[in-house]
């Protein structure tokens, strides 16, 4: 299965945080699954670190790509198609970071690893 990690799932995986559900942890750890980290998550982490909302993310904000790769995650860039799909989504979810992740999950046929239940309203598979 192709998994797109929501930003909090990525953070909790890297920090070993118990907030990450057992289902999510097992799916990410499963060598039969391919896990992806979006450029949108790098943007979100770095932005929130810069403005003081994620002080614990200093290590990650400094090298999201390198740390993600070291954990076996594949980088997912944001394409024009992702932008088009994200812009056309119904306004159920207002967060621009999550909207681009939703668009990527739809476009790339990925399940999203997220505790955010509202993502399921977009018809994507959500693991938690």
Name each model-derived stretch:
Residues 7-8, 45, 86, 105:
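Generic structural signal for small/hydrophobic residues in well-ordered secondary structure
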Residues 54-62, 68-115:
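Active-site neighborhoods of divalent-metal-dependent phosphate/nucleic-acid chemistry enzymes
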Residues 12-13, 43, 128:
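Signature tryptophan residues that serve as conserved aromatic anchors
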Residues 9, 41-42, 82, 101, ...:
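Alpha-helix capping/helix-boundary segments
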Residues 39-47:
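Short, conserved active-site loops that position catalytic residues or coordinate cofactors/metal ions
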């Amino acid at each position: 299965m192709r998994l797109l990690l929501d930003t909090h799932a990525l953070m909790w995986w890297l920090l070993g945080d118990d907030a990450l559900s057992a289902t999510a942890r097992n799916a990410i750890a499963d060598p039969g699954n391919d896990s992806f980290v979006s450029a949108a998550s790098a943007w979100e982490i770095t932005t929130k670190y810069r403005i003081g909302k994620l002080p614990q993310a200093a290590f990650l904000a400094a090298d999201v790509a390198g740390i993600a790769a070291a954990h076996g995650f594949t980088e997912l860039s944001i394409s024009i198609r992702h932008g088009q799909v994200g812009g056309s989504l119904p306004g159920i979810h207002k967060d621009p970071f999550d909207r681009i992740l939703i668009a990527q999950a739809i476009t790339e046929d990925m399940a999203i690893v997220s505790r955010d239940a509202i993502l399921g309203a977009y018809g994507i598979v959500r693991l938690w």
